[in-house]
Amino acid sequence: MSIVKVRNIFLIGPMGAGKSTIGRALAKELKLEFYDSDEVIEERAGADISWIFDIEGEEGFRRREQKVIDELTQKTNIVLATGGGVVITPENRNALAGRGTVIYLKTSLQQQFERTKRDTKRPLLQTEDLEGRLESLRDEREPFYDELADVSFETDKLTVKAVANNIIKYLYGEV
């Protein structure tokens, strides 16, 4: 049985949706290469994302992200976990939409809050009102996620394996 709907799998969604964890499991199961765009950006910069935001601002980070997304989406047979804000740049949306299957991993605000509340490595979440910030980011980005996605999957209350299996069933045309 071959995967007919995909040459690349791109995971989008908010911080804390499970893109990196599910992406690794999916790549392993499908025997594809896995990339996390944020990790690639950090490797190339020799610094973590918080440092990039501190020194270059969000604009500098988004420039780096755009370059990495353009490069990675030109590869074949990969699973790519993207950063939560990847969708705000039109060039990123075009690259993702034109070069693979875009899967939106959805999660509730409550689940997102639980998964990110102790995370000090996410510069956009360093705020007193984390829930308010998550809601604001959702309101800004969700229309882009919905528009860009070929399909979406809920991640709340499901194991990593269950979500990965649901995605695989979709890719094989079993859903």
Swiss-Prot record:
Positions that bind Mg(2+): 20
Binding residues annotated for ATP, in chain numbering: 16-21, 122
Keyword entries, A-Z: Amino-acid biosynthesis, Aromatic amino acid biosynthesis, ATP-binding, Cytoplasm, Kinase, Magnesium, Metal-binding, Nucleotide-binding, Transferase
GO cellular component: cytosol
Pfam family, one: SKI
Family: Belongs to the shikimate kinase family.
Identification of the protein by name: Shikimate kinase
Source organism (scientific name): Legionella pneumophila subsp. pneumophila (strain Philadelphia 1 / ATCC 33152 / DSM 7513)
